[in-house]
């Protein structure tokens, strides 16, 4: 993208030093002569040396007294042409449309205010096009079965882990955001954390830039950061934000699970995406797609940093505050936590002296390894209740005002919410303050705050207390009481969803992703990548054609096992007859994998028909990309006009002349979406009616008849209702789509 300064080395000072050793010998002789002159003439030798050196430097000047440095200034001509990988016509138009939108809508919007020179915009546009074409060339050269296998494996594992976490969330019967706050290492917390999502998308964008851009462009850190923000925030995040809106999700549910004749007609005409999926059917209001850069980010990492704390005794009167402490068992506290960097309501936790002391010992043990000093802990002996409370308050303040301790796992668990209304009964079994007498007691929970909790907690008394055999099966499958399994799954979930180290700092994370992108061994390509073009843009070899779709027996069995694990977690959303359904699924899995019939061939044929044929259909993929781009940026044409108007507000022209090339690309891509699509899915409906229609369609048509008979009608309906309520949460869906997109890019790259 940029030109290097051609600084030619002058050869006047040391002529021909690279061709022989004579200059070195001459330098030694001159040093010897200078030493002899110094012995003979003393300090006068410095004056003689200065005269000789001045005469030599004078020979470097022309008549106009300018030093010969031979600096060649760069020539800002046409940008380097990107690698012209032959793209199908169905994919060429979406690529040009996307590049035009990114450059004109994002870069041109702020660059026009500072400069009228379009060279920078052309260079950025050329670089983005180069990356996209290299990405397509790389994907085309890879084995299709390997890519589909990696995509399926990561999607199934991510979905299974999220469902397993939701089963733990269902057992707690608490709102989704509070569950994520109390269990920051869970998969749900990762999906709701906007800062974590942005780090994940930036990491994948950096990996794409490092692998598919020119070496000189990747080495330029300012350009790298600009391209990373364009890909991560303007492409990946805008798409996931648009697709996570409830209206979009409900339209997709109605479309994919509807059995109307219009859908069959669209499928037969291969206009499935154009006429049904996109256009007016999925065009949301602009508020769903606009991203407010000044909006606060929901980050659970900063939940306790600089939080306001109120510390009071639980059963102590004010008149007794000045008395001496006789027994530490009387030190029972009520702590009110008011977060500053997280927009949630304050909560109350109940802790004893034993819990504070345990936290202090844990932090002190960790400080022995990292060398970080822990704030001093007050002594209760010989102190009054008031003095001890002040010392304890200063201890808490010192912890929460230190970013290292405020983000510590033990500190976060200590100040996590207590969802029980009864004092000193904490359902966070972390070793701080566990009252074994009340562990089995039934205490009322606080009112639920979201529709998800209402659906999950809307159980009958019979379903709330499963039978002994069912409880045994539940305990053998997963622990629903202690949060330790969630912490043990942290590494596997981070590897499954991000694949990058979470350093907690955007700067260090960006540097790691720029210089050393993480690429697991399982995702390395099986073949050599296509030959990269030189700096002039001419390739050395053409990328080979994709291979035929064929999966090995081991990979098919792994996909089948993952599918049964996914169904197992889906069935676990309902506790009724869970042990019986688990036994049936185990028998079916054994029959499919080790039975006499070769079911793997049927699975392979299904994957080929449902996934491979659709991904290899360039017309279908091109229509999907075109329609999605036009709906993610619905008012892009108006944005171009406003940007140009602000840039030329001092001009006397009353009419803005647009770039003819951008207009032609926009008109060409707009032809893919008809203005008046004929489809029953394009009827204007209210959000509530659309929601009810989508819920009914999902419950009735999502599962096949055989699968419904195996699970039971009520069981399948209840599980699907829980899934539907989760799909109505935009933050949850956005995080899930972002991690799926990250998994797909990591599998391909």
Swiss-Prot record:
Domain PXA span(s) in chain numbering: 88-261
Membrane-topology descriptor: Single-pass type II membrane protein
Name of the gene encoding the protein in the UniProt record: mug122
UniProt function note: Has a role in meiosis.
Family listed: Belongs to the sorting nexin family.
Compartmental location: Endoplasmic reticulum membrane
This protein's name: Meiotically up-regulated gene 122 protein
UniProt KW keywords: Endoplasmic reticulum, Meiosis, Membrane, Signal-anchor, Transmembrane, Transmembrane helix
